[in-house]
């Protein structure tokens, strides 16, 4: 469990470094949030948990984990009907995101990078905080090790404006 908490905090630290960079020049290149999550976590997590993000056609797509076993439409349906509602992001509150979540009620796991829409940062932060609080409440009297993971979860707004959640 401590290894998992440490890995989650390390992922948040890596994300912060990626977003802040080393220079003062403003970078307008779009960021690949799925790749950032992939690179920040252990290979075992990449094998087990898919990372989902919006596709260009308005649907959702995913990489890694079990995503290859789904037809594209089924994958979109699972993301829109099962995973995205867990984050409870208000419609129009973000312009881009990548997330990897456990939908199983026996595990606290969630990593998300969300680019808020103009003026919607607090709405995104509130949604990420609510996800963490839900995980804590679900696990508090159920699975102690998973509660500890949820209790160690973090939400941060990085200097480039993205909201990062690690649970």
Predicted regions and their residues:
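C-terminal motif of bacterial Sec signal peptides marking the signal peptidase cleavage site
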Residues: 17-21
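Alpha-helical transmembrane segments
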Residues: 12-16
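Soluble, non-membrane globular domain cores that form compact, hydrophobic packing
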Residues: 23-110, 116-167
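Bacterial N-terminal signal peptides that target proteins for export
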Residues: 1-9
């Amino acid at each position: 469990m401590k290894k998992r908490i440490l890995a989650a905090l390390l992922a948040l630290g890596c994300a912060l470094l990626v977003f802040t960079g080393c220079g003062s020049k403003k970078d307008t290149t779009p960021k690949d949030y799925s790749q950032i999550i992939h690179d920040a976590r252990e290979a075992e997590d990449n094998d087990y948990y898919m990372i989902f993000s919006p596709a260009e056609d308005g649907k959702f797509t995913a990489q890694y984990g079990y995503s290859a076993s789904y037809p594209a439409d089924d994958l979109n349906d699972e993301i829109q009907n099962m995973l995205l509602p867990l984050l409870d992001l208000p419609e129009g509150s973000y312009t881009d995101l990548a997330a990897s979540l456990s939908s199983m009620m026996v595990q606290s796991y969630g990593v998300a990078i969300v680019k808020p829409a103009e003026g919607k940062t607090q709405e995104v932060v509130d949604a990420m905080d609510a996800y963490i609080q839900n995980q804590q409440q679900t696990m508090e009297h159920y699975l102690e090790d998973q509660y500890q993971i949820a209790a160690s979860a973090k939400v941060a707004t990085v200097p480039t404006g993205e909201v990062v959640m690690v649970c």
